[in-house]
Amino acid sequence: MKEKDITQKVLEDNNDIFADIVNVLLFDGESEVEENELVNTTVHSQYKAEDGKVHEQERDIAKYWKRGGTDIVLYGIENQTKVEKRMPARISGYEGASYRGQCDKKTIVPVITMVLYYGTDRKWTAPKNLKSLIKVPDNLDKYVNDTKANVFEIAWLTDEQIAKFTSDYKIVANFFVNKRKNKD
């Protein structure tokens, strides 16, 4: 695990920061998610690869948004400092494991993964949906699920977007915007 990744995870795992990120990036700054409504959940899951070996995958952060004791959404955050060309496939694995983990519950809630891209040299250039990574015969296209990568380019946020942050994440976002603008 990279040191910078640990620092990002520790910061974003704070409920006030996590709620602020969700509120600004998904709800345009509206206070939909309160920090006391977020509950950590497991970030580890396993899968058996085609080689027959069992592998573990680890999300960066995963939290349930609960209101009145009821699960509303499971949010996941993935931090990226470099463009990951197979990100939609990775997200499909994370989200599939999250849905599978809910199968024994009374209700299944949506899983939303947010990719926070911290690159400052270039914008995200990789595919943002699964079908862009794979060749699907036309006659099968309607049967293939198309996982989407919700990529947020932090270094390219506007001043208006950054102004909507109310937590210390505003400092982080400003840092990456300034780093991109002032390469020196």
Residue ranges and their predicted role:
Residues 1-184:
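Conserved single-residue anchors adjacent to enzymatic active/cofactor-binding motifs
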